[in-house]
């Protein structure tokens, strides 16, 4: 039985972020829909050919998305919220963009659908909305069109579909409450239709993704898989695909399904290959996810060979990435600034395809010399001086319980802070960043390229900070920010100023829609050689009598939004970052900054997928935040910010952070998230986001007032702040001014109504 290679998906955006640029040009009205569609076709063709040339036998088709693959599935099923529908009931690419962004070049603007994290990754999806009695039909044939494209190019392919049970699991009920699982019978005919169309095209295998099978699902959801897959069986071979965790706890459910193969993530799960081989039906194909799709490290192929070789020849076997390569940068070969040693430690998406080909060839032939040669740099890295810092390791070992305790409880601190800042009721602020204009990006780029000297660069940044302060004072905001003109990204900026990180030139990965990030890579022990944010915070504070927040990204978020080391625990990395940023808090305080925000938007996304593993993670995640913050004096107000979060199941840990103020993203959920804080009787101050910064729509004063009144029904008004959902980096100044003016007006109206 010959072993084949395949990937579960490939990065969509293009090496130079071509998709992002085409999307944003189209949204701005600067290019046509036909031009956008042409870029998509070009990228798909390029990526299929690149994977094929790298040694992939079965190419994924259907992994491309114009915004995200869950939203693509919603359109496939005809699941379009009424507010986003075309008048004639048709579905087009602008329908998709209205759901994701709230507006598109055609159609009426409407509130964007909710967005949240894809399992425990830094990728996002648009949450499907379900209503009682909803009807589904095949309305969006993107998958079938792309299959036709790939077949016309002569490729051997494997279409990719998000499975029906996981799709329902990922959604939310809107309107009258009901059990969304009852809709399963209604969406299955659409899946049957799609599979029939694929069978007509001669497709042998379809990858059907059911990552919900790695979760601790309620029994009713587990029971739903059998009738669902009974309905889907018989038209094509189905590769039931899971990732991000192991499947062993749900294996009894899986082996009862009428599918022909199973993909397992052997990187992030604890599944034993021998046990899987023993328990799976003998005629099933096993797809072994041996290459990490979520990191940038070169694989130890000798280790992977040993892990799987015992079952070679005993059942049909494919080797694959652990998950979609969407979460990895595209191509290491274009990284010209990484030094030779560090570069030899990495593998990006195309190199991971090459790793799969090397592994396939060795498993088919029994010849392992090429694997040993490939794996040699990994052995060298374990002993590199760039990895280990004795001073950092000593400081980490010396942490005590006192290092994570503020001097006094919140009630005492709040009195000191009220006396210091004398803020009005309903205090207004923003989350941190202001629009990253063409001028700001050009300034940073010129400096990075050496076209601008340090003095002129600093003068330019200072001017943008000054303008941000002027804008905020004109708007009447109560607590200001410096706007972060000097920062390219909230994680990358800190990584650039901390030892232990390296950076890529083109290591872009998709976050959501057209938003791409370039995560830093943790290659060694982390320390802070010098202050990072103090100079600009101090300068901004010198321009105004109002308080200016110091802005830090928290340790867990820096960890989650970086590519971490694989040779130490995540806890170790987080606490090393916390110690480095603890020194930054002390320096900001000494410079006269009285309010310091430590953003932890990723705290919840870092949760293990299985609830039974949560406690250990939350214990060290909370401790890392507290180590970071606890050096602050009582009169220094510590803020934190979180987004895309469901809080009700981690409220104990949110409270344990002991931040004086927490700002959260709530507008897309219509203040629904505040239920968690109300039920828990959260004791500290809260700033529920009053408008969605991911949409260019400007909220009205009345809309914001209504949300704040709804918030005040759950949280005492004296503990409420008024702020947007998130930072304003991706917005333009006209809409930012208009939205903030309405926000400030709404706060003033509520003060007068007291």
Swiss-Prot record:
Keywords, alphabetical: Amino-acid biosynthesis, Metal-binding, Methionine biosynthesis, Methyltransferase, Repeat, Transferase, Zinc
Chain positions recorded as 5-methyltetrahydropteroyltri-L-glutamate binding sites: 17-20, 117, 515-516, 561, 605
Gene3D superfamilies to which the protein is assigned, alphabetical: 3.20.20.210
Cofactor annotation comment: Binds 1 zinc ion per subunit.
Entry EC number(s): 2.1.1.14
UniProt keyword Cytoplasm present: no
Positions annotated to bind Zn(2+): 641, 643, 665, 726
Pathway listed: Amino-acid biosynthesis; L-methionine biosynthesis via de novo pathway; L-methionine from L-homocysteine (MetE route): step 1/1
Sites where the protein binds L-homocysteine: 431-433, 484, 599
Transmembrane segments: none
Alphabetized HAMAP family for the sequence: Meth_synth
Family: Belongs to the vitamin-B12 independent methionine synthase family.
Function summary: Catalyzes the transfer of a methyl group from 5-methyltetrahydrofolate to homocysteine resulting in methionine formation.
Protein name: 5-methyltetrahydropteroyltriglutamate--homocysteine methyltransferase
Organism from which the protein derives: Salmonella paratyphi B (strain ATCC BAA-1250 / SPB7)
């Amino acid at each position: 039985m010959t072993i084949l290679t395949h990937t579960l998906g490939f990065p969509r955006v293009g090496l130079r972020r071509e998709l992002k640029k085409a999307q944003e040009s189209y949204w701005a009205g600067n290019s046509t829909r036909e031009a956008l569609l042409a870029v998509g076709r070009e990228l798909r063709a390029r990526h299929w050919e690149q994977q094929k040339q790298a040694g992939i036998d079965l190419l994924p088709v259907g992994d491309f998305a114009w915004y995200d693959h869950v939203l693509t599935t919603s359109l496939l099923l005809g699941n379009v919220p009424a507010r986003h529908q075309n008048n004639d009931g048709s579905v087009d690419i602008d329908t998709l963009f209205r759901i994701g962004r709230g507006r598109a070049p055609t159609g009426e603007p409407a509130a964007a659908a909710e967005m949240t994290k894809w399992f425990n990754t830094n990728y996002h999806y648009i949450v499907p909305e379900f209503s009682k009695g909803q009807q589904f039909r095949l309305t969006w044939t993107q998958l079938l069109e792309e299959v036709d494209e790939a077949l016309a190019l002569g490729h051997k392919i494997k279409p990719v579909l998000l499975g029906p049970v996981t799709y329902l699991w990922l959604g939310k009920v809107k309107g009258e409450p009901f059990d969304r699982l009852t809709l399963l019978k209604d969406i299955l005919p659409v899946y049957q239709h799609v599979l029939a169309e694929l069978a007509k095209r001669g497709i042998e295998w379809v990858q059907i993704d059911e990552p919900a099978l790695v979760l601790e699902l309620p029994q009713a959801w587990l029971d739903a898989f059998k009738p669902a897959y009974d309905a889907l069986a018989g038209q094509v071979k189905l590769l039931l695909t899971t990732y991000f965790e192991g499947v062993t706890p749900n294996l009894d459910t899986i082996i009862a399904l009428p599918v022909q193969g199973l993909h397992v993530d052997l990187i992030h799960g604890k599944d034993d290959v021998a046990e899987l081989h023993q328990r799976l039906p003998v005629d099933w194909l096993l797809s072994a996810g041996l290459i990490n799709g979520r990191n940038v490290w070169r694989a130890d192929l000798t280790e992977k060979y040993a892990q799987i070789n015992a079952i070679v020849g005993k059942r049909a076997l494919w080797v694959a990435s652990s998950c979609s390569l969407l979460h990895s940068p595209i191509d290491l070969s274009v990284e010209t600034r990484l030094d030779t040693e560090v570069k030899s430690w990495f593998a990006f998406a195309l190199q991971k395809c090459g790793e799969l080909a090397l592994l396939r060839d060795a498993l088919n032939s029994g010849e392992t010399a090429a694997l040993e040669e490939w794996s040699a740099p990994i052995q060298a890295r374990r002993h590199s001086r760039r990895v280990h810092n004795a001073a950092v390791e000593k400081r980490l070992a010396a942490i005590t319980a006192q290092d994570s305790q503020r001097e006094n409880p919140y009630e005492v601190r709040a009195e000191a802070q009220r006396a210091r800042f004398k803020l009005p009721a309903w205090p207004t602020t923003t989350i941190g960043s202001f629009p990253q204009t063409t001028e700001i990006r050009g300034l940073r780029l010129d400096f990075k390229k050496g076209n601008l000297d340090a003095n002129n660069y600093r003068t330019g940044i200072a001017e943008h900070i000054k303008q941000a302060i002027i804008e905020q004072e004109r708007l009447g905001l109560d607590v200001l920010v410096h706007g972060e003109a000097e920062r390219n990204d909230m994680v990358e900026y800190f990584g650039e100023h901390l030892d232990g990180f390296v950076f890529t030139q083109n290591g872009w990965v998709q976050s959501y829609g057209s938003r791409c990030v370039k995560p830093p890579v943790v290659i060694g022990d982390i320390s802070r050689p010098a202050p990072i944010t103090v100079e600009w915070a101090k300068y901004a504070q010198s321009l105004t009598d109002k308080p200016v927040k110091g802005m830090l990204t928290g340790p867990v978020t820096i960890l989650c939004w970086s590519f971490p080391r694989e040779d130490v625990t995540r806890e170790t990395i987080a606490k090393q970052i916390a110690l480095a940023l603890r020194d930054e808090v002390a320096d900001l305080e000494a410079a006269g900054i009285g309010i310091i925000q430590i953003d932890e938007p990723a705290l919840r996304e870092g949760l293990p997928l299985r609830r039974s593993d949560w406690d250990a993670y939350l214990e060290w995640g909370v401790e890392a935040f507290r180590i970071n913050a606890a050096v602050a004096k009582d009169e220094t107000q510590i803020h934190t910010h979180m987004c895309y979060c469901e809080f009700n199941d981690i409220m104990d840990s949110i409270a344990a952070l002991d931040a004086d103020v927490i700002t959260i993203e709530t507008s897309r959920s219509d203040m629904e998230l505040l239920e968690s804080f109300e039920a828990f009787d959260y004791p500290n101050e809260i700033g529920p986001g009053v408008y969605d910064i991911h949409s260019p729509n400007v909220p009205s004063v009345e809309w914001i007032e209504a949300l704040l009144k709804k918030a005040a029904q759950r949280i005492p008004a004296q503990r409420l702040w008024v702020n947007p959902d998130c930072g304003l980096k991706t917005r333009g100044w006209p809409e930012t001014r208009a939205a903030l003016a309405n926000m400030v007006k709404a706060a003033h109206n509520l003060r007068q109504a007291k």
